[in-house]
Regions:
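N-terminal hydrophobic targeting signals that begin at the initiator methionine
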Residues: 1-2
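N-terminal targeting sequences that direct proteins away from the cytosol to non-cytosolic compartments
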Residues: 6-8, 15-81, 154, 162-185
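Short, hydrophobic/aromatic-rich segments at coil-to-beta transitions
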Residues: 49-55, 81-86, 128-137
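Second-shell loop/turn segments in exported
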Residues: 56, 97-104, 123, 137, ...
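Glycine-centered tight beta-turn/hairpin loop motif at sheet-sheet or coil-to-beta transitions
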Residues: 57-61, 91-96, 140-143, 155
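A short acidic-to-branched-hydrophobic micro-motif
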Residues: 87-110
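A short, polar/proline- and glycine-enriched secondary-structure boundary/capping micro-motif
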Residues: 108-110, 146, 169-173
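Signature of long, low-cysteine stretches enriched in small and polar/charged residues
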Residues: 112-157
Length: 185
């Protein structure tokens, strides 16, 4: 498993550096699936390691690429009541959670302000495949979680959380998955 992450990390390191550099210049994180897909396609190791499919979330009209190494976890009634739409795991400690957050109709800007004021999170504006978003991270119990947040037409915030992103190998995988979020066709 560590070799798999090392291969993914090596294959995406150059692209990740370019994305970070351009994000710093523009002050807005720009993620584009076409760039990541081209980089993956150019590497046999990355293609093998990231083999998977797009999963469409009908209730949110978005899709996200999920590698075959991830398994969808069945949600409990409590999970659904907490707003979870889907949860994917890889191994025992790596995962992607997709959740609605009822924020009373807040905009992304208002939500960012709330996260900063109430929790001290540093939020960045983002555009993911043309969709306005908010990106932030937090650490709890030495485990970093990175989140993309999108505003919905119904006044909710849709959060897609990736953890642990302080694991370099998983951070590389999370970067690919973040860049894959796009409107469902």
């Amino acid at each position: 498993m560590k070799k798999l992450f090392a291969l993914i990390l090596a294959a995406l390191m150059v692209l990740g550096c370019v994305a970070v550099a351009s994000a710093e210049q523009a002050q807005t994180l720009q993620l584009n699936w076409e760039e990541y897909a081209a980089e993956i396609e150019a590497s046999e190791e990355a293609k093998a390691a990231l083999s998977g499919d797009f999963v469409t979330m009908e209730e949110i009209a978005l899709k996200i690429y999920i590698p075959a190494a991830f398994k969808q976890t069945e949600l409990t009634d409590e999970d659904r009541e907490a707003g979870y739409i889907a949860y994917f795991t890889m191994g025992e400690d790596k995962g992607v959670g997709i959740q609605y957050v009822d924020v009373g109709g807040m905009s992304l800007e208002e939500y960012a302000q709330r996260l900063t004021e109430e929790y001290g999170y540093e939020c960045k504006d983002a555009v993911v495949n043309g969709l306005p978003a908010l990106a932030y991270s937090f650490t709890e119990n030495d485990r970093e979680t990175s989140v993309l947040a999108f505003s919905t037409e119904k006044g909710y915030i849709l959060e897609i959380a990736f953890a642990p992103t302080n694991d370099e190998g998983f951070a590389a995988v999370a970067a690919v998955l973040m860049a894959s979020v796009q409107a469902a066709e």
